[in-house]
């Protein structure tokens, strides 16, 4: 993947401004509410019966924050995201048996949450850079499935 200077700077800027403990939980909660079939991967998280229960679930919050911090690895290794996530791809495919389509759903939810947080600063150009970055992450996480 070729990154422009603008794309690199934009991705680093976005992640430097994110409140991980807010955006991560909001992203995972949104995914679990909008795409309820994704809840099957989180059976040990307890009460996921409705949007309020999901939003208030401490395990959802913790894992959402963990996911967002996991993206730091991609931000720091933008030239080698596929290898950066090789082990994580194996874990999700072989041990956790996560449908790789769910990575895209989560990425879409993150894009929505980030757009809402950034407001008018999340211009079309910024969104294009962010979605390109997330597409590379999604592809890398799904790599083991191919």
Curated annotation (Swiss-Prot):
CDD domains attached to this UniProt entry: Hb-beta-like (cd08925)
Any one Gene Ontology molecular-function term assigned to this protein's record: oxygen carrier activity
Matches recorded under InterPro entries: Globin, Globin-like_sf, Globin/Proto, Hemoglobin_b, Hemoglobin_oxygen_transport
Tissue: Red blood cells.
Residue ranges of every copy of the Globin domain listed in the record: 2-146
Keywords: Heme, Iron, Metal-binding, Oxygen transport, Transport
GO cellular component: blood microparticle; haptoglobin-hemoglobin complex; hemoglobin complex
Pfam families: Globin
UniProt-annotated binding residues for heme b: 63, 92
Source superkingdom: Eukaryota
GO biological process: hydrogen peroxide catabolic process
This protein's record includes keyword Signal: no
Assembly and binders: HbC is a heterotetramer of two alpha chains and two beta-C chains.
Family: Belongs to the globin family.
Role this protein plays: Involved in oxygen transport from gills to the various peripheral tissues.
Further comment: This fish has three hemoglobins: Hb1 (major) and two minor hemoglobins (about 1-2% of the total).
Designated name of the protein: Hemoglobin subunit beta-C
Protein species of origin: Trematomus bernacchii
Lineage of source species: Eukaryota, Metazoa, Chordata, Craniata, Vertebrata
Gene name per UniProt: hbbc
């Amino acid at each position: 993947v070729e990154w422009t200077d603008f794309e690199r700077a934009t991705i680093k800027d976005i992640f430097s401004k994110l409140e991980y403990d807010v955006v991560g939980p909001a992203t995972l909660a949104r995914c679990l509410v909008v795409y309820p079939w994704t809840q099957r991967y989180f059976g040990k998280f307890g009460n996921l019966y409705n949007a309020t229960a999901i939003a208030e679930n401490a395990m959802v919050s913790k894992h959402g924050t963990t996911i967002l911090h996991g993206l730091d690895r991609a931000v720091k290794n933008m030239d080698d995201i596929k290898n950066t996530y090789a082990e994580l791809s194996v874990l999700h495919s072989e041990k956790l048996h996560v449908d790789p389509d769910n990575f895209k759903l989560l990425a879409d939810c993150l894009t929505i949450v980030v757009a809402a947080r950034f407001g008018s600063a999340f211009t079309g150009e910024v969104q294009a850079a962010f979605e390109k970055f997330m597409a590379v992450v999604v592809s890398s996480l799904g790599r083991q499935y191919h």
